[in-house]
Amino acid sequence: MTDAAQTYERICALALQLPGVELGTSYGTPAIKVKGKLMARLRSEAEGGLALRCDFLERQMLLQAAPEAFYLTPHYKDYPMILIKLDEVRTDALPDLIERAWRMVAPKRLVAAYDAESAPKKKR
């Protein structure tokens, strides 16, 4: 198994820990969705590449901070997505990237329920 394939498996495992996440397809390639909405997909046009939902400000920061791992093509410039080289991205960055992408596409109620469940419980 290649590093890119292992990284994609790790991304799927991380994503599936979040509520409402399901694996599916998009444009004929493996995809990660939340309640049917696209969160990420493997890019068939770039082996080892992943398109991940990402807001524009964070995208600019990622492109500047780690250009070896993050990139953009003209097709994606107007979409809130970042392209990731799976064999170059730092795996310790994945949990936060995945959760932020999930928050962008998950229904507000699902996010609120997740936050309430994840919040530290107060002792009485």
Predicted features, each with a name:
Residues 1-124:
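Charge-dense, helix-prone N-terminal extensions
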